[in-house]
């Protein structure tokens, strides 16, 4: 099943986003500008692209795994969210996680990937307690942040 995504190329000098391989979930996003990131530095980098995410869907901006492994480039708010109502340019909050080496992003570099997924638009219903609402206890309860174990043997 395929859904169309309307895109506006704000910088005609850059290619349209594309998948590296058939069946890949994400399309690559390109940098419009040259940016130098010192270790630990972050920057909001323009992509030269605007999209019209269909209602009931969301765009998620993920890091490119190869860049994360090779040079420590990641996204501060990973994944970034592009809501269906947003019509501005997609920008990516990049960060250089390398503790020593600066990193240079050049115009035209593939810096992130955009995934578009369906999203459930839930209606919030306030209840006084989960018990009163008939929502049974679970084996997990309120356990989080390491409650499933494994943290001692990383």
From Swiss-Prot:
Reaction catalysed? dUTP + H2O = dUMP + diphosphate + H(+)
Q: In which pathway does it act?
A: Pyrimidine metabolism; dUMP biosynthesis; dUMP from dCTP (dUTP route): step 2/2
Q: Which GO terms describe its biological process?
A: dUMP biosynthetic process; dUTP catabolic process
Q: Per its record, how is this protein called by name? A: Deoxyuridine 5'-triphosphate nucleotidohydrolase
EC annotation from Swiss-Prot or TrEMBL:
3.6.1.23
Q: What are the GO MF terms of this UniProt record?
A: dUTP diphosphatase activity; magnesium ion binding
InterPro entries to which the protein is assigned, alphabetical = dUTPase, dUTPase-like, dUTPase-like_sf, dUTPase_trimeric
Cite the record's note on assembly.
Answer: Homotrimer.
Q: Which UniProt keywords apply?
A: Hydrolase, Magnesium, Metal-binding, Nucleotide metabolism
What cofactors does the UniProt entry give for this protein? Mg(2+)
Task: Give the gene symbol.
Answer: dut
Described purpose of this protein according to its UniProt entry = This enzyme is involved in nucleotide metabolism: it produces dUMP, the immediate precursor of thymidine nucleotides and it decreases the intracellular concentration of dUTP so that uracil cannot be incorporated into DNA.
Organism superkingdom: Bacteria
This chain's source organism reads Mycobacterium leprae (strain TN)
Q: What remark does the entry add?
A: Each trimer binds three substrate molecules. The ligands are bound between subunits, and for each substrate molecule, residues from adjacent subunits contribute to the binding interactions.
Q: Which family does it belong to?
A: Belongs to the dUTPase family.
Q: Which residues bind substrate?
A: 64-66, 77, 81-83, 91
